[in-house]
């Protein structure tokens, strides 16, 4: 048998975006090839050993709801789990986990090697095969040519990557890996708009040289221990470890200031812009000069290593300065640095040159995902990779592209922000970026997306069965609470007083009682007349039971707010999803200013909603566009054709609550 050289989809890069892209397209039945420069680094956590966080955890849950691997791999490799913002409302609660780098990478590789329709091949890609205005394949560094209907490029920080430590620099995709110089040059020939960004990583420390007696311990959540995947179990977690906390001080800051004359950031050597929300320690000292201390988290890298990741001191200062600043902190006076911190500059491409499917507008069948689009973070990369993989598979199968709306998923917010607003610095997801965050919670990601994922072909039978059991149980139990009543005669005074603080004076449904502050689902079910709850085999599944209770309680307690938000979504959606024709010349739209028509012709928004979010767009311009479309009978609602998920949002409103 000849070695296969023709595929439906080729994925270039084996990081968080590439692995999710390859798995997604293969799950859909597309014959997929994953090309990576080193099979041993598939799924590698290049920077921090953690997954999740505010906004990021929401993306991981959405990837999981669509059948992705990140959440499940984190459950298998996670060595500490916490719920952030646990005392706040459900919209901003977020899961975060420390992961054993080796276990996480093994979990990802195991899934890749056992995924039907997926081939792996270790070779860097030096060239893309482009015929006319579409991509038709990729060429490896030794000249092997693979053809495909679609190519997903997930190059991370490797495109013309340059690593900086002090005033020394060298080419590299990350420490120990070569940069993709030839591929970068080839992409520049395609005249896609591009720029340079920068990110960084801290020095790593040998835990045997840390004095933990001087540090504050930060354990994970233990009762209950969180899980990331909707199918996960706490029993899957390996041994759990604490993190530790120290702080910078005035001496630390003086050491950093003394080295700024040899900092590549402050001497103009680095041209790329770094991430605003994950700044280097030298940037923190400069931007927050009045602050005399910064918190530093010492995070274990795994169960079989002594290496610690000091979260909060990402730096590109010279090594002698790195050593001095580490030794200036409490508990690290004798610390041995195993690896120096560094900054890395790399090419990215303006995401406004992409469709919402993450396909480039200029070259058919070429998809970009991850840091190549100007984002930062494993979670943002994985979410984009999943979407690009789905749409590359659909492109190869000659089906319409799919992308969730802003009111459907954080993934929709992420993509819409990228393709309409672009980036001037590495983009990080936050809950504050979503207009409808009460509807886009971690706990209901499956209710929002799993049915769509099933239609797309990325959700398997096991997940689909678990989802249906949960959805049906939530619906049945919510209805029971709304139709079960207690009266002053049936509810003893002592029970009412214990739960509500006073006896009831008239008839209430259990749902009405649950809506009161401080009243829990278990408390209501403990009342005389309120007994029951999810039954049959569900009660034996503790995790599923906990998920069901959480959905019911949030849905009932926040019902008014959720319904109000749903009404707002419906009102705003009237024009939000109206498509703009591909070939429209905006200079011919009467009344539009030259500036507005120029921007519309440059960025080619797909919908009225996207057009409204372009910088400089005015309400008057949007009104003129709507008049133009109506006069010519153009425009249709996005999602009203054969694209999956067109009707799922409305059908699942009650289940989401």
Curated annotation (Swiss-Prot):
<dbReference type="InterPro" id="IPR044920">
    <property type="entry name" value="MnmG_C_subdom_sf"/>
</dbReference>
<dbReference type="GO" id="GO:0030488">
    <property type="term" value="P:tRNA methylation"/>
</dbReference>
<feature type="region of interest" description="Disordered">
    <location>
        <begin position="635"/>
        <end position="657"/>
    </location>
</feature>
<dbReference type="Pfam" id="PF13932">
    <property type="entry name" value="SAM_GIDA_C"/>
</dbReference>
<dbReference type="GO" id="GO:0005829">
    <property type="term" value="C:cytosol"/>
</dbReference>
<dbReference type="InterPro" id="IPR020595">
    <property type="entry name" value="MnmG-rel_CS"/>
</dbReference>
<dbReference type="GO" id="GO:0050660">
    <property type="term" value="F:flavin adenine dinucleotide binding"/>
</dbReference>
<keyword id="KW-0274">FAD</keyword>
<keyword id="KW-0963">Cytoplasm</keyword>
<keyword id="KW-0520">NAD</keyword>
<feature type="binding site">
    <location>
        <begin position="274"/>
        <end position="288"/>
    </location>
    <ligand>
        <name>NAD(+)</name>
    </ligand>
</feature>
<dbReference type="InterPro" id="IPR004416">
    <property type="entry name" value="MnmG"/>
</dbReference>
<protein>
    <recommendedName>
        <fullName>tRNA uridine 5-carboxymethylaminomethyl modification enzyme MnmG</fullName>
    </recommendedName>
</protein>
<dbReference type="InterPro" id="IPR049312">
    <property type="entry name" value="GIDA_C_N"/>
</dbReference>
<keyword id="KW-0819">tRNA processing</keyword>
<dbReference type="GO" id="GO:0002098">
    <property type="term" value="P:tRNA wobble uridine modification"/>
</dbReference>
<comment type="subunit">
    <text>Homodimer. Heterotetramer of two MnmE and two MnmG subunits.</text>
</comment>
<comment type="function">
    <text>NAD-binding protein involved in the addition of a carboxymethylaminomethyl (cmnm) group at the wobble position (U34) of certain tRNAs, forming tRNA-cmnm(5)s(2)U34.</text>
</comment>
<dbReference type="InterPro" id="IPR002218">
    <property type="entry name" value="MnmG-rel"/>
</dbReference>
<comment type="similarity">
    <text>Belongs to the MnmG family.</text>
</comment>
<dbReference type="Pfam" id="PF21680">
    <property type="entry name" value="GIDA_C_1st"/>
</dbReference>
<keyword id="KW-0285">Flavoprotein</keyword>
<dbReference type="InterPro" id="IPR047001">
    <property type="entry name" value="MnmG_C_subdom"/>
</dbReference>
<dbReference type="InterPro" id="IPR026904">
    <property type="entry name" value="MnmG_C"/>
</dbReference>
<dbReference type="InterPro" id="IPR040131">
    <property type="entry name" value="MnmG_N"/>
</dbReference>
<feature type="binding site">
    <location>
        <begin position="13"/>
        <end position="18"/>
    </location>
    <ligand>
        <name>FAD</name>
    </ligand>
</feature>
<dbReference type="InterPro" id="IPR036188">
    <property type="entry name" value="FAD/NAD-bd_sf"/>
</dbReference>
<dbReference type="Pfam" id="PF01134">
    <property type="entry name" value="GIDA"/>
</dbReference>
